[in-house]
Regions:
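Terminal targeting signals and extreme-terminal segments of soluble enzymes
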Residues: 1-166
Length: 166
């Protein structure tokens, strides 16, 4: 059986890939971008590049979401890359509330659906419920042939959330 398929989200085609923003935290603080991020071509949807916003801008209408094109050198990603990609993007709550400090993962489950057929992948991370600093972040990853190749869910905690969210 294979007639139920999760399609690429509409956000995939609402902006040109050239409008996406290279993930780079050095605007926040020089040297802040982790080395493992620098090994990855990661282009974030322009609506989700919270680190490029002015500090006084309102995040009220922003989604708790982060979408990106991902590519590592070496060709088509394997299952290890898919697992790595399932927790690679910034916490989605930063797009909604701005930088919040440490947001550790408590649990993470990744499902490898199939091996990708393209070297570039598209990831869409979203959260819909935040309660007392805890939230679940769902991720779906597609290859550019529109095959869902991996999905994940993680339970995450915003530390000192009452300072930023209440």
């Amino acid at each position: 059986y294979d007639d139920l398929q999760k399609p690429l989200p509409n956000i995939f085609s609402d902006k040109d890939k050239n409008d996406y923003v290279k993930m780079n935290y050095d605007k926040i603080s020089k040297g802040f971008t982790p080395a493992f991020i620098q090994q990855l071509e990661c282009d974030i949807h322009p609506d989700h590049a919270w680190w490029n916003r002015e500090p006084d801008s309102s995040n009220k209408d922003n989604e708790a979401r982060c979408s990106a094109f991902l590519e590592m050198k070496g060709g088509v990603p394997d299952q290890f890359c898919l697992s790595f990609f399932s927790d690679i993007l910034p916490p989605v709550v930063c797009n909604k509330y701005g930088p919040l400090g440490w947001i550790p993962t408590i649990t993470l489950t990744t499902h490898i659906r199939k091996m990708p057929s393209t070297s570039v992948l598209y990831a869409d991370f979203k959260a819909s419920d935040i309660n007392k600093g805890y939230f679940e972040q769902d991720c779906n990853i597609w290859d550019l042939d529109a095959n869902l190749v991996a999905s994940s869910r993680q339970l995450t905690r915003i530390l000192k959330s009452e300072e930023k969210i209440s």
